[in-house]
């Protein structure tokens, strides 16, 4: 099985940042991306396990994959649905 996180077109390192900074950085990064492009987010704030999926739902982006069993957490999102 291939690693979905390895296919990301963009990457955001949010390690050490605390709420609300990671989501603010995700929003800024996604704004610069084209529709359909992917972003890998690496974070260690436990709030991101709730905030990143909520951000995707609210802003109509796709959460392709997430790894939240251990830190650093990883999220792969696609701009748009």
UniProtKB/Swiss-Prot annotation:
Signal peptide range in chain numbering: none
Cellular component, GO, one term: cytoplasm
Key word Cytoplasm present: yes
An annotated GO BP: tRNA wobble position uridine thiolation
SUPFAM superfamilies: SirA-like
InterPro entries tied to this protein: Sulphur_carrier_TusA, TusA-like, TusA-like_sf
Entry annotation: catalytic residues: 19
Record's keyword annotation contains Nucleus: no
Compartments (UniProt record): Cytoplasm
GO molecular function term, any single one: sulfur carrier activity
Highest taxon of source: Bacteria
Main subcellular localisation: cytoplasm
Keyword line: Cytoplasm
Similarity-based family: Belongs to the sulfur carrier protein TusA family.
Function per UniProt: Sulfur carrier protein which probably makes part of a sulfur-relay system.
Name the UniProt record assigns to this protein: Sulfur carrier protein TusA
Gene (UniProt): tusA
């Amino acid at each position: 099985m291939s690693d979905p996180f390895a296919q990301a077109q963009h990457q955001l390192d949010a390690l050490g940042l605390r709420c609300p900074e990671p989501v603010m950085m995700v929003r800024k990064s996604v704004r610069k991306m084209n529709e359909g492009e992917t972003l890998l987010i690496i974070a260690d704030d436990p709030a991101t396990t709730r905030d990143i999926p909520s951000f995707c739902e609210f802003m109509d982006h796709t959460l392709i994959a997430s790894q939240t069993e251990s830190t650093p957490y990883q999220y792969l999102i696609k701009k748009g649905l």
